[in-house]
């Protein structure tokens, strides 16, 4: 006897939970290869996130300020749907998308309270990678 088709894929779809959070934190991780933006509430629970690679940019185009701007707009719009009005921005990393991602969040109408650089700096910890010779 043949098995009946299982609707497990249709059952797993969950409705998006709408939170009503006014204040949050935007974590911008700007590496040399990609930029990842995560918007959380004050406790650190993620409300929305986006990355340059997730927006269709591949290869070296992921590491451009424009790709970071597009990713910030996507994450910011999703956060506005959750009720975000004020953000503190924490930027980590030396990448090219640092400034453009903050500008994109401000252009969406989100009020930016503070901008902090939380790039980890070693107190002479691990040995760095060897210098690149071109």
Curated annotation (Swiss-Prot):
SUPFAM superfamilies according to UniProt: Translational machinery components
GO BP, sorted A to Z: translation
Highest taxon in the source lineage: Bacteria
Presence of the UniProt keyword Ribonucleoprotein in the record: yes
GO cellular component terms given for this protein: ribonucleoprotein complex; ribosome
Disulfide pattern: none
Keyword RNA-binding: yes
Keywords from the named record: Ribonucleoprotein, Ribosomal protein, RNA-binding, rRNA-binding
Any matching Pfam family: Ribosomal_S11
GO molecular function annotation: rRNA binding; structural constituent of ribosome
Record function comment: Located on the platform of the 30S subunit, it bridges several disparate RNA helices of the 16S rRNA. Forms part of the Shine-Dalgarno cleft in the 70S ribosome.
Record's subunit section: Part of the 30S ribosomal subunit. Interacts with proteins S7 and S18. Binds to IF-3.
Listed HAMAP family: Ribosomal_uS11
Family of the protein in this entry: Belongs to the universal ribosomal protein uS11 family.
Protein name listed in UniProt: Small ribosomal subunit protein uS11
Organism: Polaromonas naphthalenivorans (strain CJ2)
Taxonomic placement: Bacteria, Pseudomonadati, Pseudomonadota, Betaproteobacteria, Burkholderiales
